[in-house]
């Protein structure tokens, strides 16, 4: 499947790096009672995440500040924060992470271990390829559990396909329509970096 990054994104973030991995024919199920591998992976990611957190105030982390600055460069929904900030906040609060499904657990553990936003979509649910760019405004978006449309704002940075927004505010919230589930067979995973000097891989 074709993945496109529009020039409007590069105009805002000329030093960014968007890494994409395509997976085909996968089994996205696991019996956690018999195989606790993904719970252990999440625990390891959360433990390593402390390397990127100020014990007194997680918001002072340079990784959190980096993404807050990035979000200030485009139109966002009030209160929207990057996915990595949400994960680091949960770690700082001492909250436990429980498995969702193997692919989601994998990208969440990588995200915490390296302080990089990671995400993924069900390739078979995308229509006409995946793009990252600036919203025209009004692209339909239904997050998990929502019954009402929460369309993208004009100028917002979003992932989108021919049917609408796939992930809003770059990496803030994804659509239920294309999210990874245990039924997913083909998937696209994405890792985002805005400031290459902060990559710890």
PLM segments and residue spans:
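Conserved phosphate/anionic-ligand binding catalytic regions in large, soluble enzymes, centered on
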Residues: 96-120
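A generic local secondary-structure boundary/capping motif
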Residues: 7-11, 98-101, 122, 144-149, ...
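Conserved alpha/beta core surface patches that mediate binding of polyanionic ligands
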Residues: 1-5, 160-179
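Class I SAM-dependent methyltransferase SAM-binding "motif I" and its flanking Rossmann-like core
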Residues: 111-138, 156
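Glycine/proline-rich, flexible active-site/cofactor-binding loop segments
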Residues: 33-87, 92
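A structural-propensity feature for long, helix-poor, extended segments
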Residues: 135-167
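Gly/serine-rich nucleotide phosphate-binding loop at the start of the catalytic core
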Residues: 2, 9-44
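Conserved small/polar residues in nucleotide/adenosyl-binding loops
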Residues: 199-201
């Amino acid at each position: 499947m074709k993945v496109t990054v529009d020039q409007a994104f590069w105009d805002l973030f000329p030093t960014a790096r968007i890494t994409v991995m395509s997976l085909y024919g996968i089994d996205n199920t696991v019996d956690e009672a018999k195989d606790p591998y993904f719970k252990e992976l999440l625990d390891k990611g959360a433990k390593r995440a402390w390397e990127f957190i100020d014990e007194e105030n997680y918001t002072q982390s340079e990784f959190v500040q980096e993404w807050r600055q990035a979000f200030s460069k485009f139109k966002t929904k009030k209160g929207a924060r990057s996915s990595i900030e949400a994960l680091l906040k949960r770690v700082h609060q001492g909250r436990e992470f429980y498995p969702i499904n193997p692919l989601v657990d994998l990208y969440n553990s990588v995200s915490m271990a390296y302080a990089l936003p990671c995400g993924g979509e069900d390739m078979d649910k995308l229509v006409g390829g995946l793009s990252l760019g600036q919203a025209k405004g009004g692209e339909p978006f239904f997050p998990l559990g929502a019954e009402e449309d929460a369309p993208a704002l004009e100028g917002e940075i979003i992932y989108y396909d021919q049917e609408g927004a796939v992930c809003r505010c770059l990496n803030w919230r994804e659509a239920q329509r294309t999210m990874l589930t245990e039924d997913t067979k083909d998937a696209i995973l994405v890792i985002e970096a805005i400031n290459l000097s902060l990559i710890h891989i």
